[in-house]
Amino acid sequence: MKTKILSLANEEVGEITLNKDIFAVEFIRDDIIKQVIDWQRAKAMFGNHKTKTVSEVSGTTKKPFKQKGTGNARQGSLRSVQMRGGGISHGPKVRSHAIKLPKKVRKLGLIHALSEKYAEEKLLIIDSLKLDKPKTSILVNLLSKFQGQSFFVIDGNKVDINFSLATKNIYNTLIVPQIGANVYDIIRHEYVLLSQEAVSFLEERLR
């Protein structure tokens, strides 16, 4: 399956053969894409939320007043959950939110996400993801030729430092090395730009 290779100026500079089993799956499985995104987002959660229980709250263990004769409801501790400044009952605890997902499904998610972008003609192969200067204005001018609102750029083994610095001030533009290709960022950005090195890596990784 042949497709165009473009320059950053959106000019055709050649052709590349893509593996249709990775970049052009016939039936897009949105359910698999959603499963992988849920897995990614759950894994990214810190899970460091925590409230103190009765046994962890600082304070005295002395009974606040005698059991009988005050007219008040009986109380055993100032740290009880019903007291101001007391412990929290059934509050959140530090835990991992990560869920298990088979590696095969994670691979399929990436394949179907790439295929979806290709079907929408929003997956583009770029001949070179390098800039002479780390100037945001230069990159904004180049990306404007693609008429997109957001870009997920997947470079080769190493990201060009000038390109990376130039993206810092551009809203909704992200560049990652080839190992950083992921379903969530592919789906949430309008355009996906791949270097030729990234294409080779993904075909090797997902075959």
Swiss-Prot record:
The keyword Signal does not apply. GO terms for molecular function: rRNA binding; structural constituent of ribosome. Residues 56-75 are annotated as: Disordered. It comes from the Bacteria. One of its GO terms (cellular component) is ribosome. Pfam families: Ribosomal_L4. GO terms for biological process: translation. InterPro entries: Ribosomal_uL4, Ribosomal_uL4-like, Ribosomal_uL4_dom_sf. The keyword Ribosomal protein applies. Keywords: Ribonucleoprotein, Ribosomal protein, RNA-binding, rRNA-binding. Part of the 50S ribosomal subunit. Belongs to the universal ribosomal protein uL4 family. One of the primary rRNA binding proteins, this protein initially binds near the 5'-end of the 23S rRNA. It is important during the early stages of 50S assembly. It makes multiple contacts with different domains of the 23S rRNA in the assembled 50S subunit and ribosome. This is Large ribosomal subunit protein uL4. It comes from Rickettsia prowazekii (strain Madrid E). The gene is rplD.
